[in-house]
C-alpha cells in the first residue's frame, strides 16, 4: 500500500497505489506502478506477503519517501560571492586564497509550519544551518560529482527547525571541488556556489517558497582551503580564529555589513544525491604522543585512515599551530597534507577539518607552547554511511588479518560515493583500480545507491566520440581500455549482485558507444596503440614493475608500447564484447548480442594466432595474470585449454614459487579466473605468503592498510590489490550466486587438509541473510547453512562418506526442505528450501 499521508496508511487506504495480491516469487526490485507522483510529494508505504498456504504476514512497519525536483521545478538561482575568484599568476595555478563563504537569508513565518523541506545543491561542499543549528549529521556533502556537467542536491527536512516569526537559513560553503581544474568551463567560475529552494507548508495549507537569489547576503568565513585541489595539492585547511563571528548563523545576528551575493548561470544538470551521505563513522583514539624536538610533537593515531583530525588548543593570539600528516613513521608529511590553526583573541579553541580531509597515521604538531595530552586529540574516519552485508572469520590469523585490512582499506577509499585510488595524492575514481575493488565491495557492503551514483558519473564523462576517460567523476589520470571498460564491468557486476535490470538498460547506450569507439582504434581485428605516455596502459604495478618500467624508459619506451600490454588490452576487448553480449541478451537485443559475439570470435582468433607460444603453451611472457585472462576469455582453443591451465599452475607454483604475480588490472583477472574455476588451492597458496610479493608482506610493513605496489614504495592506503577480499566469503565460506541477486545460490566451501578447519561467513542479500558456518573436528564436518525466504540453495559436498550424512538427527533423505539435486561418486549436491540446516558428515580425506 502507498498513501499520501500517514493517517491514510494507518487506515489501510492506499490512495496512491494498492498492488493487491500478486502471485509471484519476486520480492525485490518491485517497481512502483501507482498514481503519477509530483515533485516534493511525500509517500508513505507498507507491505505484507503470504506463503504458499495463503497465510498472511503482518504489515511491515510504515516507511516513507519524498519525491525530488525536476529541472522545471527549480525557481532558485545559483549564488556565489563576487569577491571570491580563484587566483592564478600568468596562467599558473597558485595556492587557493579564497576563504570559504558564508551565506544568509532571513524570512518570517506567521506560524510554525506543518511541513518544510529544503533542497540544497552546491558546487563544492556545503553545510546547512537553520536558526543557528546545523541540519543533519552528514559531512562533506554532497557526493563528489562531475561539476562540468552536473551538480547534486541534498534534501533536508527542516520542519522542526523553523519557528513562528523570524527565521534564518544559513549556508557554509567549502571551496573544495569547485576549483578542481577538470571541472572548469566558461559559464561556471572556479568558486563555490549554491542553489537553494525551501518548500514550506503551513497548517492552513498555505505554501511558501524560499529560494536563493540576489537578496541573500555573504561574508568570508574563518576557514580557507590550502592548496588548489588537484593531484598532489589537496593539502588541507587554515582556520583563523581571529576572523570568527559568533552566532553568524543565528536569527538575531547583525549582517548589515555583509555583501550581497552574485547570481550565476551555469548550465548544470541538477540531480538528487540519492546515496548514503558521508558521516563520522569511527572515532580514532591516539596511541601516543612524543616530543621529537623542543616544541614539536608527533602523535601516533594507531592506524592509517582518511577523515578528520580534531584537537583542543590554546595559545596566544596570532599563534599558528601546524598539523602535518604522514603515512610513514619516518616521514614528516605525506603528499603535502597539512592544516593550520591560528589562535584568536579567545586564546583557545578546537581545530577540526570541515571541507577537506586528511590521510595518515602520524601527525606532527608544531607551534604549541605546551605538551598536548591524548585526551585533547581524536580522529574521525569518514565514509558514506552504507551498511556491512558480508562477514568472514576463520582459524588462520593471517587470513583474518588480510580480510580485515582489505575492508578497512576499501572503506577509507570510498569517501564521496566513489572509490578512489588513494585519498591523499590523487583522489581519482580510476576504472582500472575499480577492477580490483568492485567485487570485493559488492560482496561485503550494501552498495546499491553507491554504485548507481558512480555509474551515472561514468555515463556523464563519456566524450562525444564515444571514448570514456580513465576516471570518473574526476576526468583526469592515465589508463587504458580496462580503465574505460569499467563502464561495462560496473553495470554487469551490479546486476549480478542485485538483479536490478535498470542499471543495464540505463548504461547500454554508453556501452555501445564505447565499443564503437574501440573499433576506430583497431586494425586487422586487434586494437593498436593510441594516445600518449599515460594512455593504452595494460596491467599496472605488477611485482617488479618499477624496475621494468625504469628499463623501458631508458630505451625511450612507455608501458603502452609493450607486447604484453597489446596482448592484455586485446584480451580485455574480448571480455568487454562478451560481457556486452550478455547484457544485450538480458535486455532482449538478440541481434546486437550476436554481433558482439561474432566480433569477439574474430578478435579471439587474431589474438591467439599472434601471441600464442606453442612451445611453452603460453602467451607473451607467461605471467600468470596474462594466462588467466586468456583462459577467462576462452582464448586458447578447446584442445589447448588444459595445457594452458597446466602452464598457469607451473608459473604460479614453480616459476613464482607460490607468489601472486599480477598488478591492479591483470591481477584482478588472475584472482577471479582462479576463483570462478574453483582453484582455491592456488589462491590459498598465494594468500599465505608473507614475503614479497604478498599481502602478508604488506601487513608486516603497513599501518593497517594495503599499499599501492607490492614493493610498498608508493601510497600506503591504496586500492591496488583489494580483489583478494572477494575470495573469503565466496570460496572459504562457499557462498556463490548462481542467479542474479542471489535468488538462487550455491553453498560450496573449500574444505581441505591444508586450508582453514573452521569458517564462519555470511552475506546479507536483499532476500535476507545467507550463512555458511562450518568446522572439521576429528574428521567430521559440521556445517550450518541458512537459506533466506523466497530463495533456494544448492549445497555441494565432495569427498564425503554419504552413509554418514545427516541433517540434525535425521538422515539427509528424511530432512524437511532437503532434496537430491545430483550425486556422483563421493560427491553430492542437495537442493535446499528456505530455512536453517545443520549437517554433519564424515570426511573421506581424513581431515582432523
PLM regions and their residue ranges:
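Active-site acid/base region of carbohydrate-active enzymes
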Residues: 124-125, 195, 211-220, 372-405, ...
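Extracellular/oxidizing-compartment recognition motifs
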Residues: 1-42, 46-424, 432, 449-450, ...
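Alpha-helical support elements that line or immediately flank enzyme active sites
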Residues: 116-120, 130, 308-325, 353, ...
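Short helix-capping and inter-helix turn/linker motifs at the boundaries of alpha-helical repeat units
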Residues: 97-98, 301, 428-429, 481-482, ...
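Non-catalytic C-terminal accessory modules of carbohydrate-active enzymes
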Residues: 193-197, 211-247, 273-282, 598, ...
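Active/binding-pocket-proximal capping segment
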Residues: 126, 134-142, 458-459, 509-514, ...
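C-terminal capping/lid segments that line or modulate ligand- or cofactor-binding pockets
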Residues: 169, 234-235, 239-240, 425-426, ...
Amino acid at each position: 500500500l502507498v498513501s499520501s499521508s500517514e493517517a491514510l496508511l494507518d487506515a489501510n487506504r492506499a490512495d496512491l497505489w494498492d498492488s493487491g495480491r500478486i502471485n509471484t516469487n519476486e520480492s525485490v526490485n518491485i517497481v512502483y506502478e501507482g498514481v503519477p507522483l509530483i515533485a516534493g510529494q511525500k509517500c508513505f508505504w507498507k507491505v505484507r506477503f503470504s506463503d504458499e498456504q495463503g497465510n498472511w504476514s503482518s504489515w511491515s512497519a510504515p516507511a516513507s519517501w519524498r519525491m525530488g525536483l525536476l529541472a522545471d521545478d527549480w525557481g532558485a538561482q545559483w549564488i556565489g560571492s563576487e569577491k571570491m575568484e580563484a587566483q592564478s599568476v600568468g596562467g599558473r595555478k597558485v595556492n587557493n586564497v579564497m576563504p570559504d563563504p558564508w551565506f544568509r537569508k532571513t524570512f518570517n513565518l506567521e506560524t510554525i509550519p506543518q511541513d518544510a523541506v529544503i533542497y540544497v545543491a552546491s558546487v563544492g561542499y556545503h553545510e546547512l544551518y537553520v536558526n543557528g543549528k546545523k541540519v543533519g549529521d552528514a559531512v562533506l556533502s554532497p557526493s563528489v560529482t562531475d561539476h562540468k556537467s552536473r551538480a547534486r542536491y541534498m534534501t533536508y527536512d527542516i520542519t522542526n527547525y523553523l519557528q513562528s516569526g523570524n527565521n534564518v537559513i544559513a549556508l557554509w560553503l567549502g571551496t573544495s571541488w569547485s576549483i578542481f581544474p577538470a571541472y572548469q568551463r566558461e559559464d561556471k567560475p572556479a568558486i563555490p556556489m549554491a542553489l537553494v529552494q525551501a518548500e514550506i507548508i503551513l497548517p492552513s495549507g498555505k505554501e511558501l517558497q524560499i529560494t536563493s537569489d540576489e537578496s541573500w547576503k555573504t561574508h568570508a568565513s574563518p576557514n580557507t582551503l590550502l592548496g588548489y585541489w588537484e593531484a598532489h595539492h589537496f593539502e588541507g585547511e587554515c582556520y583563523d580564529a581571529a576572523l570568527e563571528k559568533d552566532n553568524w548563523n543565528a536569527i538575531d545576528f547583525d549582517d548589515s555589513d555583509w555583501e550581497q551575493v552574485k547570481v550565476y548561470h551555469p548550465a548544470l544538470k541538477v540531480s538528487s544525491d540519492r546515496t548514503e551521505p558521508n558521516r563520522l563513522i569511527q572515532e580514532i583514539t591516539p596511541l601516543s604522543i612524543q616530543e621529537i624536538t623542543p616544541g614539536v610533537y608527533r602523535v601516533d593515531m594507531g592506524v592509517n585512515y582518511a577523515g578528520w583530525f580534531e584537537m583542543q588548543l590554546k595559545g596566544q593570539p596570532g599563534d599558528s599551530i601546524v598539523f602535518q600528516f604522514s603515512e610513514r613513521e619516518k616521514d614528516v608529511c605525506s603528499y603535502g597534507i597539512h592544516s593550520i590553526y591560528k589562535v584568536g583573541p579567545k586564546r583557545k579553541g578546537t581545530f577540526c577539518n570541515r571541507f577537506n580531509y586528511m590521510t595518515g597515521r602520524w601527525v606532527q604538531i608544531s607551534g604549541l607552547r605546551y605538551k598536548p595530552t591524548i585526551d585533547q586529540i581524536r580522529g574521525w574516519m569518514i565514509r558514506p554511511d552504507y551498511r556491512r552485508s558480508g562477514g568472514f572469520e576463520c582459524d588462520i590469523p593471517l587470513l583474518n588479518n588480510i580480510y580485515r585490512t582489505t575492508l578497512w582499506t576499501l572503506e577509507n577509499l570510498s569517501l564521496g560515493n566513489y572509490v578512489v585510488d588513494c585519498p591523499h595524492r590523487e583522489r581519482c575514481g580510476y576504472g582500472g583500480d575499480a577492477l580490483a575493488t568492485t567485487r570485493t565491495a559488492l560482496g561485503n557492503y550494501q552498495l546499491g545507491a553507491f554504485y548507481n551514483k558512480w555509474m551515472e558519473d561514468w555515463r556523464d564523462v563519456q566524450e562525444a566520440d564515444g571514448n570514456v576517460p580513465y576516471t570518473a567523476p574526476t576526468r583526469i589520470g592515465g589508463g587504458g581500455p580496462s580503465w574505460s571498460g569499467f563502464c561495462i564491468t560496473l553495470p554487469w557486476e551490479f546486476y549480478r549482485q542485485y538483479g536490478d535490470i535498470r542499471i543495464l538498460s540505463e548504461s547500454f547506450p554508453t556501452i555501445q558507444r564505447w565499443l564503437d569507439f574501440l573499433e576506430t582504434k583497431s586494425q586487422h581485428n586487434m586494437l593498436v596503440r593510441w594516445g600518449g605516455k599515460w594512455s593504452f596502459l595494460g596491467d599496472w604495478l605488477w611485482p617488479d614493475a618499477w624496475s621494468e618500467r625504469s628499463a623501458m624508459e631508458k630505451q625511450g619506451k612507455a608501458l603502452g608500447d609493450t607486447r604484453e600490454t597489446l596482448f592484455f588490452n586485446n584480451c580485455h576487448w574480448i571480455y568487454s564484447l562478451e560481457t556486452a553480449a550478455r547484457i544485450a541478451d538480458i535486455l532482449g537485443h538478440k541481434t546486437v548480442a550476436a554481433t558482439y559475439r561474432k566480433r569477439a570470435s574474430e578478435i579471439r582468433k587474431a589474438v591467439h594466432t599472434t601471441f600464442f607460444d606453442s612451445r611453452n603453451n603460453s602467451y607473451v611472457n607467461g605471467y600468470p595474470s596474462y594466462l588467466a585472462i586468456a583462459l577467462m576469455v576462452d582464448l586458447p582453443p578447446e584442445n589447448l585449454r588444459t595445457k594452458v591451465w597446466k602452464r598457469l599452475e607451473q608459473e604460479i607454483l614453480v616459476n613464482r614459487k607460490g607468489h601472486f604475480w599480477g598488478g591492479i588490472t591483470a591481477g584482478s583477472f588472475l584472482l577471479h579466473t582462479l576463483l570462478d574455476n574453483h582453484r582455491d588451492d592456488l589462491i590459498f597458496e598465494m594468500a599465505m605468503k608473507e614475503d614479497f610479493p604478498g599481502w602478508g608482506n604488506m601487513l608486516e610493513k603497513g599501518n593497517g592498510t594495503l599499499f599501492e605496489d607490492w614493493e610498498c614504495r608508493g601510497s600506503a592506503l591504496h586500492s591496488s590489490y583489494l580483489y583478494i577480499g572477494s575470495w573469503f566469503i565466496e570460496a572459504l565460506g562457499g557462498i556463490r550466486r548462481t542467479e542474479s541477486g542471489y535468488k538462487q545460490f550455491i553453498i560450496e566451501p573449500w574444505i581441505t587438509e591444508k586450508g582453514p578447519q573452521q569458517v564462519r561467513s555470511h552475506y546479507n542479500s536483499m532476500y535476507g541473510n545467507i550463512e555458511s558456518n562450518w568446522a572439521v573436528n576429528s574428521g567430521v564436518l559440521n556445517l550450518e547453512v541458512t537459506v533466506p525466504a523466497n530463495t533456494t540453495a544448492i549445497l555441494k559436498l565432495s569427498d564425503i562418506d554419504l552413509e554418514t550424512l545427516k541433517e540434525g538427527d535425521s538422515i539427509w533423505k528424511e530432512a524437511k526442505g532437503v532434496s537430491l539435486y545430483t550425486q556422483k561418486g563421493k560427491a553430492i549436491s542437495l537442493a535446499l528450501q528456505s530455512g536453517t540446516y545443520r549437517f554433519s558428515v564424515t570426511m573421506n580425506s581424513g581431515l582432523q
